[in-house]
Amino acid sequence: MHKSIIAAAIVAAGFSTAAYADAHSITVGVSWSDFQEERWKTDEAAMLGALEAAGAEYLSADAQSSATKQLADVESLITQGVDALIILAQDGASIGPALDAAEAAGIPVIGYDRL
């Protein structure tokens, strides 16, 4: 996984929210379509390392191959107060409402792999 994706999430969160103004660290939420593939586990380790190095927090959710669950997962990440989202969409056509919710909350989204 490219560190530039993580850097983009951190920069987007830092410039689009008051994350620094209210003295809390940036939290990046990652919505995985299905965490069973070995590739995603490797990518997660890279994400964790990059986020930790930047002083950011990491939250994740595994949709378990369910577009419906992924929508609920993203809404949960938004409710938990993430400053940026990285989404590996289970279904590009079904993820729209989650993207709309993130936009309404002012949360930048990085489409990862399939979006």
Located regions from the model:
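A residue-level marker of the well-folded mature domains of exported/periplasmic proteins
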Residues: 3-13, 20-115
